[in-house]
Amino acid sequence: MQLFRHSYSTLVIIGGCILLLVSFGIRHSSGLYLIPISEHIQTGREVFGFAIAIQFLMIGIGSPIFGAIADKYSSSVAGLLGVIFFLIGLYLMSLVEGSFLLIISQVIFGFGCAGCGTAVILGAVGKAVTGKYQTLSLGVVMAAGSLGQFLIVPLTGFLIEMSDWQRSILYLCFISLIMILFSL
C-alpha cells in the first residue's frame, strides 16, 4: 500500500508539473501576440490589452468554480474541463478576424487557465502528498510553472518569427494536447 501511495503521489506531482509548465508558459506568451493580432484586426493595442484583461478576470472568476468542481467530483475532472476550455480558447485565438472573437477567445481561454491553474493543481498535489514532503512537492510544481514561462515564451517568439502568428498558435495548441494526458 505504501508503494502504491508513493507511486500515485509521484504521478500527481509529474502531472501537475507538466500542466503548470505548459499552461503558465502559454498563458504568459499572450503578450507576444500584441503587435501581430492588433495589426491583423486593424485596431490599436487597447483592444488586445482589454482582451488580456478579460482573460485574467476570467481566471479569477473561474478559479473558485473549478475548485468547487474539484471538491465535488475530482481534480481530474476539473483539470480536464480546464484543458478543454484552454484548447478551445487558444484555437479560437488563431481564428481571430475582429475584436469580438478576440475577446470571446480570451474569455474561454482565461476560464480554461483557471481549470488547469494553481487552484486545481496545487489542491490535487496537496491531497496526494502528505507529511513532510508536501511543501517540497508544492514548491516543485510551482517551480515547473515558472520553468514553463522560461521555456515556452521564447519558443513562442521563435514560432512567431519562423511562421505567422496564427500558425504559431496552432503549434501551441498541438503542444497543449499533452495536457489532456496529464490532467487525467
Task: Cite the ranges covered by each PLM segment.
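Helix-loop-helix hairpin linking two adjacent transmembrane segments in secondary transporters
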Residues: V141-L184
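Helix-to-loop junctions at the C-terminal end of transmembrane segments
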Residues: G62-S74
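Primarily marks hydrophobic transmembrane alpha-helices of the MFS/SLC 12-helix fold
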Residues: S76-G79
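Helix-breaking motifs and short loop linkers at transmembrane-helix boundaries and internal kinks
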Residues: Q42, S74, L95-E97, T130
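C-terminal ends and interior cores of transmembrane alpha-helices
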Residues: I84-E97
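Paired small-residue
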Residues: G89, F100-I108
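Intracellular juxtamembrane helix-capping segments at the cytosolic ends
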Residues: I37, G115-V129
